């Protein structure tokens, strides 16, 4: 082996890399790999956009089918003879009783085809639990109105009363605000359409029964959600008709994972009887109870399971009470259960089975295991009536369930979606059926049994190469954020092995959070909680000490631990937790030698130096307690309260953390190796799911290839302790800290504690620690120093040095992908106008104040009005309305009012007018002009855009926020200057005929000319986002490395926006090399590169940050993809 250690600090959007020689401590390599974190929110945006396009496409297709139906049925329409302003809702209501012309019928039916309601509301209306929440309550009110009216009648009534019918809006009714939502079930639209068509059939013989049935099919027809797209003739792997020729019953069935140990078996539903029994048995086997064996017997487990199954209500508290009664012990004596995020006990309770026992038409207790498991499979996989009914018919071909039973199961599934929504177990029914007898007979948990039975986890790791397949490794990591970070890390491991050979050790630390925003919020939350607690402690201490808000600064002189002691004093309710005595703040400040900060459990056992393992106690009590736990020591101490008294006090405390409570009340024998191992796993080793996946996959890979690389995953809190003890400050302003953390992680594998953890370190008879290396007895402080002592001389000094910091390499994931979003989806209208100081007509994008009656709408109006009211289109094109309606309202109605608390607050004059007279109307002699709800204005001059103007439009229609893609760099030998050509995603398109996605040479040449690139200029290279760019001043020899962001400022030739090499952004006004000047005060670095006396080079890096300078990248740019 190479004596090298690889440390990896895997973050959400970064991987720190550190390689050192474990013998000499020499730092071999260090770099930070930076990449954009995977954002689940982006997937949501894409899904929503796809859904919108799909809905629009289907609506369009229904309209086409309606046109075809009218043509094929001989219903001729001529819209040149009727008004284009016919109200479809009036026609729908009219059609219920009176004759409609062909044109009127078409308009009415087309309106319903476009807006046909929501199909799943038909099931929800029968669901007794659906009326939870405001939205559901309003839908329920809509359903009540449907008992006497059609959707069309309700919609027309709302339109005539409130001037609005679509969407979600609030109106005033009987002086109260009332929310209305235009949501009705598809079945209501079907009933309305049927009534209209049956009425029209009386007047028009061409409306036949066949016509009615075909229309109703167009109106209500819907592909089954579990079938997906495609059909027998047009197969696709996105639907049930696979390209392989296979036809699936349910497309979601293929998403069920395979068993971890039996790869041919599907995983069981978590709601299956077998999974519920398995989970509870595993929980019971993990419990430690006050019996001779410390475990539950087979008979006791049977009793507990029968009890749980037959109780209507069951939770952890009730179950633990039963177990305590069964064992004749206290609930507090039961240990080893799982804890949720809020610190509460967790245990499986046969929830799904107990709920299913409430079914009235089915006798669940009489069903066998196989039937219950199948039923759970059906109810987990399917969510709606159609899917459930079809699956029951398929799975139970003997017709086991009557329609009445099916109906109840459908409603049961809807009412208990949280139970069946938990998904799938990691194991198959086959594997669990093998393990359940073992769980009854032994006190072992699942993994121990699997190991004993010789079950091997199946892996698809390839032995063909010694490099790790990152795709295979991340198959079991379902969080996309974590999976992306791990993939990047594995690429780094492979590159490091390729460059440096096999490693002796690989040590990994993984991010705590899985979202960048969540990570920031979590850090802020912890920092705020700590600050609040410190402030509260100091305030209480000051009030009691001198009756003021602050303690005198002098009390802290020569007393460096006083702040910590005061915080612990506050946490502990001003008591010594070993003696139970009250601690006076005056004694704590003036007689500091009386008190000490003690580790509740020895640091040599827990490796936990956090505040959670510390208490403030009398020095005499601390000496007497020694290296024992409170449980072991208190009842034998002369001047201490009993352990029972401590237990009662700790349980009642609101200020002690859950972890501290656990440490104070532990009754485990810390001299035993398995107890020590548990603390090591808790405080040193990261046992989270994703961390275990990475650890196991790497270990299995190296084992399969007979490589003796030891892999470990450590907790972030441990490396944080090392940072603190070594005095290495962490600044997040730059990306250096990732590499520094990685080296600390690598060095952590060489600490003395790793060498000593398997030895019996504590001599409990003398309450001292034995130094195995020297044979000398050492104190707790000396042991602490030994544990946290840096493994190499000058290692810490090196990490702190400026020379070391400057030598760290950085590598960025370059974004060269070509099929990204080309622009925002918002469609903008434009107009030609002279605005402000314009000397000629310019093209302006129109803005819109959507609702002038909201406070935000009024504020937006006033902002434009005060600056330049001529920006409003109404001011120019309808001056009478602006001068005789809008401005008088502004003059006569207030813009401020006194609220309920007597305070002056802003208000909206337009809203005040509306409350008195209704909507503002355009000026007319009779005062009945159209209602005004919004106002358009000239917003900004048209810049970069995509033209989507229809052929018959007089004004441009555009998309804005056009996204830049890449920049091609050219060199003009005549002028001696570089020229930059910017390309956007919108410049790419599919070539007609070939279907190739590309930029045509003709279009490229047009852009080249527009960008000021000479036809004879020499192509140098292409820059994508996050490519590195080296700029050299050929006169002064100064040079600086940048990250390329984009070609910018399109009206300025050859300008680009740059980012710093070693951090996220520049400081405002930051100095660059002289030829480029300074960064703008805003922090943006936009610079023209068309200068004399500079040289530009592309710098390509690998994942380890190794740099390769590129002067030329081929003869011509790539235009085909």
UniProtKB/Swiss-Prot annotation:
Q: Which Pfam families match?
A: Cas9_a, Cas9_PI2, CRISPR_Cas9_WED, HNH_4, RuvC_III
State any single GO MF term: endonuclease activity
- Swiss-Prot/TrEMBL keywords: Antiviral defense, DNA-binding, Endonuclease, Hydrolase, Magnesium, Manganese, Metal-binding, Nuclease, RNA-binding
Q: Where is the active site?
A: 9 (for ruvc-like nuclease domain), 599 (proton acceptor for hnh nuclease domain)
Positions annotated to bind Mg(2+) 1: 9, 509, 513
Key word rRNA-binding present in the record?
no
Q: What residues does Mg(2+) 2 bind to?
A: 9, 513, 738
Q: What is its EC number?
A: 3.1.-.-
- Needed cofactors: Mg(2+)
One Gene Ontology term of the biological-process aspect is: defense response to virus
Looking at the record, the residues that make up the HNH Cas9-type domain are 516-684
Q: Give the record's biotechnology entry.
A: The simplicity of the Cas9-gRNAs RNA-directed DNA endonuclease activity may be used to target and modify a DNA sequence of interest.
The domain of life for this entry's organism is Bacteria
For this chain, the family text in UniProt reads:
Belongs to the CRISPR-associated protein Cas9 family. Subtype II-A subfamily.
Report quaternary structure and partners.
Answer: Monomer. Binds crRNA and tracrRNA.
Q: What is known of its domains?
A: Has 2 endonuclease domains. The discontinuous RuvC-like domain cleaves the target DNA noncomplementary to crRNA while the HNH nuclease domain cleaves the target DNA complementary to crRNA.
| Stated role | CRISPR (clustered regularly interspaced short palindromic repeat) is an adaptive immune system that provides protection against mobile genetic elements (viruses, transposable elements and conjugative plasmids). CRISPR clusters contain spacers, sequences complementary to antecedent mobile elements, and target invading nucleic acids. CRISPR clusters are transcribed and processed into CRISPR RNA (crRNA). In type II CRISPR systems correct processing of pre-crRNA requires a trans-encoded small RNA (tracrRNA), endogenous ribonuclease 3 (rnc) and this protein.
What's the protein here called? CRISPR-associated endonuclease Cas9 1
Q: Which organism is it from?
A: Streptococcus thermophilus (strain ATCC BAA-491 / LMD-9)
């Amino acid at each position: 082996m190479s004596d090298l250690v690889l440390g990896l600090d895997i973050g959400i959007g970064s991987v720190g890399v550190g390689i050192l020689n474990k013998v000499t401590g020499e730092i071999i390599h260090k770099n930070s790999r930076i990449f954009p974190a995977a954002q689940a929110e982006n997937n949501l945006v894409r899904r929503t956009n796809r859904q919108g396009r799909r809905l629009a496409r289907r609506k369009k297709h229904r309209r086409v089918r309606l046109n075809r139906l009218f043509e094929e049925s001989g219903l001729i329409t001529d819209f040149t003879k009727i008004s284009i302003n016919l109200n479809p809702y009036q026609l729908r209501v009219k059609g219920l009783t009176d004759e409609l012309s062909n044109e009127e019928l078409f308009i009415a039916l087309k309106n319903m085809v476009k807006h046909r309601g929501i199909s799943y509301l038909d099931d929800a209306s029968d669901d007794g639990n659906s009326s939870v929440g405001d939205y559901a309550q309003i839908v329920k009110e809509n359903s009540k109105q449907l008992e006497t009216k059609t959707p069309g009648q309700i919609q027309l009534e709302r339109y005539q009363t409130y001037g609005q019918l679509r969407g979600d809006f609030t109106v005033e009714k009987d002086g109260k605000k009332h929310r209305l939502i235009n949501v009705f079930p598809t079945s209501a639209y079907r009933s309305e359409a049927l009534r209209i068509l049956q009425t029209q059939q009386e007047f028009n013989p061409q409306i036949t029964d066949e016509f009615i049935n075909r229309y109703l099919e167009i109106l209500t027809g819907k592909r089954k959600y579990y079938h997906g797209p495609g059909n027998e003739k047009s197969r696709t792997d996105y639907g049930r008709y696979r390209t392989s020729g296979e036809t699936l019953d349910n497309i979601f069935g293929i998403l069920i994972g395979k068993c971890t140990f039996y790869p041919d078996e599907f995983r069981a539903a978590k709601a299956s009887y077998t999974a519920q029994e398995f989970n509870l048995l595993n929980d019971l086997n993990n419990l430690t109870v006050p019996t001779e064996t410390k475990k539950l017997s087979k008979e006791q487990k049977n009793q507990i399971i029968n009890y749980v199954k037959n109780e209507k209500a069951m939770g952890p508290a009730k179950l633990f009470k039963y177990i305590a009664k069964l064992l004749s012990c206290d609930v507090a004596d039961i240990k080893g259960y799982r804890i949720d995020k809020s610190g509460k006990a967790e245990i499986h309770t046969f929830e799904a089975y107990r709920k299913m026992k409430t079914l009235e038409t089915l006798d669940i207790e009489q069903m066998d295991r196989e039937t219950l498991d199948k039923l759970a499979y059906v109810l987990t996989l399917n969510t709606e009536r159609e899917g459930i009914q079809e699956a029951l018919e398929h799975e139970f071909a003997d017709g086991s369930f009557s329609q009445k039973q099916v109906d109840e199961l459908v409603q049961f599934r809807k009412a208990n979606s949280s139970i069946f929504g938990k998904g799938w177990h990691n194991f198959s029914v086959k594997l669990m059926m093998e393990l359940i007898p073992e769980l009854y007979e032994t006190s072992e948990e699942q993994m121990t049994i699997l190991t004993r039975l010789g079950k091997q986890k199946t892996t698809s790791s390839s032995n063909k190469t010694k490099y790790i397949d990152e795709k295979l490794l991340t198959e079991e990591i379902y969080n996309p954020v974590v999976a992306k970070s791990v993939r990047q890390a594995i690429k780094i491991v492979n590159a490091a092995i390729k460059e440096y050979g096999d490693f002796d050790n690989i040590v990994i630390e993984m991010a705590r959070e899985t979202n960048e925003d969540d990570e920031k919020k979590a850090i802020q939350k912890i920092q705020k909680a700590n600050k609040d607690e410190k402030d509260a402690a100091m305030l209480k201490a000051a009030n009691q000490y001198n009756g003021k808000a602050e303690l005198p600064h002098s009390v802290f002189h020569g007393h460096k631990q006083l702040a910590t002691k005061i915080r612990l004093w506050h946490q502990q309710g001003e008591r010594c937790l070993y003696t139970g005595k009250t601690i006076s703040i005056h004694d704590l400040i003036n007689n500091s030698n009386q008190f000490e900060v003690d580790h509740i459990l020895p640091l040599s056992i827990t490796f936990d130096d956090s505040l959670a393992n510390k208490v403030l106690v009398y020095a005499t009590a601390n000496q007497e307690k020694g290296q024992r736990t409170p449980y072991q020591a208190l009842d034998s101490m002369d001047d201490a309260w009993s352990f029972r008294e401590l237990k009662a006090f700790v349980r009642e405390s609101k200020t002690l953390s859950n972890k501290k409570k656990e440490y104070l009340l532990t009754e485990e024998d810390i001299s035993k190796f398995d107890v020590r191992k548990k603390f090591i796993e808790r405080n040193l080793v990261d046992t989270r799911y994703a961390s275990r996946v990475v650890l196991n996959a790497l270990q299995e890979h190296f084992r399969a290839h007979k490589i003796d690389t030891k892999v470990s995953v450590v907790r972030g809190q441990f490396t944080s302790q090392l940072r603190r003890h070594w005095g290495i400050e962490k600044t997040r302003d730059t990306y250096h800290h990732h590499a520094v953390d990685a080296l600390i992680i690598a060095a952590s594998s060489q600490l003395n504690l790793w060498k000593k953890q398997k030895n019996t370190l504590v001599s409990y008879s003398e309450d001292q620690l034995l130094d195995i290396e020297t044979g000398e007895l050492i104190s707790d402080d000396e042991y602490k120093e030994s544990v946290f002592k840096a493994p190499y001389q000058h290692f810490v000094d090196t990490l702190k040095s400026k020379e070391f910091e400057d030598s760290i390499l950085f590598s960025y994931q370059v974004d060269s992908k070509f099929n990204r979003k080309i622009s925002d989806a918002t469609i903008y209208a434009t107009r030609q106008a002279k605005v402000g100081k314009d000397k000629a007509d310019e093209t302006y994008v129109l803005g819109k104040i959507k609702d002038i009656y909201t406070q935000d709408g009024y504020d937006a109006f006033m902002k434009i009005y005060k600056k330049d009211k001529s920006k409003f289109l109404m001011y120019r094109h309808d001056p009478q309305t602006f001068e005789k309606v809008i401005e008088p309202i502004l003059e006569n109605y207030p813009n401020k009012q006194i609220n309920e608390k007597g305070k002056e607050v802003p208000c909206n004059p337009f809203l005040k007018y509306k409350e008195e007279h209704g909507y503002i109307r355009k000026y007319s002699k009779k005062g009945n002009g159209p209602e005004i709800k919004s106002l358009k204005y000239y917003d900004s001059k048209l810049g970069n855009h995509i033209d989507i103007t229809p052929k018959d439009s007089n004004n441009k229609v555009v998309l804005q926020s056009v996204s830049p893609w890449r920049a091609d760099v050219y060199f003009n030998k005549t002028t001696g200057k570089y020229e930059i050509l910017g390309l956007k995603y919108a410049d790419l398109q599919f070539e007609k005929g070939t279907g190739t996605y590309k930029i045509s040479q003709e279009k490229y040449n047009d852009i080249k000319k527009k960008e000021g690139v000479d036809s004879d200029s020499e192509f140098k290279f292409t820059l994508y986002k996050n490519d590195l760019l080296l700029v050299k001043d050929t006169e002064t020899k100064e040079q600086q490395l940048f990250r390329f962001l984009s070609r910018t400022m399109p009206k300025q030739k050859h300008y680009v926006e740059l980012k710093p090499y070693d951090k996220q952004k520049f400081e405002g006004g930051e100095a660059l090399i002289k030829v480029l000047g300074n960064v703008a005060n805003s922090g943006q670095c936009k610079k023209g590169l068309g200068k004399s006396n500079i040289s530009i080079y592309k710098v390509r890096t690998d994942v380890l940050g190794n740099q390769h300078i590129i002067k030329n990248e081929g003869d011509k740019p790539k235009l085909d993809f």
